[in-house]
Swiss-Prot record:
Keywords: Hydrolase, Metal-binding, Zinc. This is N-acetyl-alpha-D-glucosaminyl L-malate deacetylase 1. One of its GO terms (biological process) is bacillithiol biosynthetic process. Its EC number is 3.5.1.-. The gene is bshB1. Its cofactor is Zn(2+). One of its GO terms (molecular function) is metal ion binding. The lineage of its organism: Bacteria, Bacillati, Bacillota, Bacilli, Bacillales. The keyword ATP-binding does not apply. Transmembrane segments: none annotated. Pfam families: PIG-L.
Length: 234
């Protein structure tokens, strides 16, 4: 296959939506191919079931315009630095050949989110080594960025999602089992105004960069701008 433009990894289905659903919708609307890879089935989540979460993930993907979504069924709360996990992620990277890869930001209250970022970073490096898993052709990712799930960290750069906030909210609301208690659910940090908190964060980031809403991202490397700083104005 020719490869994805963007491949976003998350520890659980809904992680990617929380961090960058607006950005994904923005790029799929422009015709770019975007994929999502969830590492676990979130089987330890307080609400919902594995089967329901997978159905919700399919709905959210469709809302964002994502045609490729995978789940590696790694153990929830067991995302440790293991060679077998790195190899599985390398297979995904080499199969789908993304230009850009995203994963959660390392500083997050949930250990699975931080460990997901570390595993993906290791896999990106290994995916470019020719003699590592030689049965698959090597692939070098052009850039690796981190999106935010929990917290209000100061981003290295932002992407304007003002026109796509409604899609982000719709994608999040697809996870009804996670963001509302329902008749048989229990209260968690996700059910107590979490979506509203995410919206407030994107509004804050937007205010800092002069737009209505924006998603913030982190990068360990300097970011090269591909647009005129003056927007073509003279």
């Amino acid at each position: 296959m020719s490869g994805l433009h963007i491949l976003a990894f998350g520890a659980h289905a809904d992680d990617v939506e929380i961090g960058m659903a607006g950005t994904i919708a923005k790029y799929t609307k422009q015709g770019y191919e975007v994929g999502i890879c969830d590492l676990t089935e979130a089987d330890l989540s307080s609400n919902g079931t594995i089967e329901l979460r997978k159905e919700e993930a399919k709905v959210a993907a469709r809302i964002m315009g994502v045609k490729t979504r995978l789940n590696l069924a790694m153990p929830d709360r067991g995302l440790y630095m293991k060679e077998e996990y790195i190899r599985e992620i390398v297979k995904v990277i080499r199969t789908y050949k993304p230009k850009l890869v995203f994963a959660p930001y390392y500083e997050d209250r949930h250990p699975d989110h931080a460990n997901c970022a570390k595993l993906v970073e290791e896999a990106i490096f290994s995916a470019g080594i020719r003699k590592y898993m030689p049965e698959l052709s090597p692939h070098r990712v052009e850039s690796f960025y981190n999106y935010m799930i929990n917290g209000f960290h100061k981003p290295n750069f932002c992407i304007d999602i003002s026109e796509y906030l409604s899609i982000k909210v719709e994608a999040l609301e697809a996870y009804e089992s996670q963001f509302s208690t329902g008749s048989d659910g229990v209260k968690t940090p996700l059910t107590e105004g979490y979506v509203e908190t995410v919206i407030a964060r994107e509004k804050m980031f937007g205010k800092e960069v002069g737009v209505l809403y924006a998603e913030g991202f982190m990068s360990k490397k300097p970011v090269l701008l591909h647009a005129d700083l003056l927007g073509g104005c003279k």
